[in-house]
Amino acid sequence: MARVYNFSAGPSMLPEKVLKQAQAELLVYGDSGQSVMEMSHRSKWFDAIITETEATLRRVMNIPDHYKIGFFQGGATQQFAMVPLNFMTTGKADYIVTGNFSNLAAKEAAKFGEANIVASSKDKNFTYIPDVNAIPYNKDASYIHICQNNTIFGTQYVEVPQVEGVPLVADMSSMILSKPVDVTKYGCIYFGVQKNVAPAGMAIAIIRDDLLGKAADNVPTMMNYTTLINKDSMYNTPPCWCIYMTGLVLKYLENDIGGLANMQKINEAKAKVLYDYLDGQDFYNNPVEHRYRSTMNVTFTSPNPDMDKKFCAEAAEAGFVNLKGHRLVGGMRASIYNAMPSEGIDKLVDFMEKFRKANA
């Protein structure tokens, strides 16, 4: 059976070259005589894997030495609690709510202190990003939290908050590695890997070292960033397979794509094809303010919900799967992460036009 074009928001497509390499190494990795899924995390082979994965991430993202990297189980949702447990030293933090996940992060933080929602785009169903330069931030906030790309509603920040003395914490789950990021603008960057990096089962956090070591004594051991980072993510058994796959994807980005600047050009070209088509007809509609349209997650609707269902069903039959929009939005969503080839976008647009002509 031929591979489909998978537009899932996550878990999502992985580069075919990476999958083939993982397939080739599945039974026997290097000279270990065993699979990565079987080997001890204390073995010399896995030690080399995790060390090289971190080193490659530092190169690809240009992460300075005074930032620490941790590989965590629990996904980005667990980070919603870890962030306030580790960083809310003043008892309060500022949250900008631009969608479902930033809202969930704020609700989780409110269990541990004062989570001030200083701005929200809920008034227009999260179809824009508030002006980060016009927000009344709290000077005594421990940090400012954002979700930099909103998977469900299809928006992205065009600039990020910068408040002197208040670190910025960003959930980058659905846009990480899609373009270069100035890491020094952030106190902490975290992301689940299942959207743009690797199979589900892990989150990665990149943390400025001056923010570490401030968690209260009663914070559970495995919810303390310092626990894992001081042990090089090996305090307990790490998600070995995810780390291995992350390493393969990073090397693919570095060696085959040529880095994140090239990846950004490819991604923006892919998104332009789809958005240009959406803007050139009146059967489908994208509700997002143009300036804030996500490069990774493109949302659209047809004339009515029944037509949306018909579209998704016929698209799946044609080899375009997981286009159904999130239940909070409806319609359709094409998640076009790094691994989605340009031909997948071109063929999707061709299908959309044929469907439009048949149903207009």
Residue ranges with predicted function:
Residues 32-79, 86, 100, 108:
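Conserved N-terminal alpha-helix of the aminotransferase class I/II PLP-enzyme fold
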Residues 188, 193-275, 289, 358-360:
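Active-site C-terminal subdomain of aminotransferase-like
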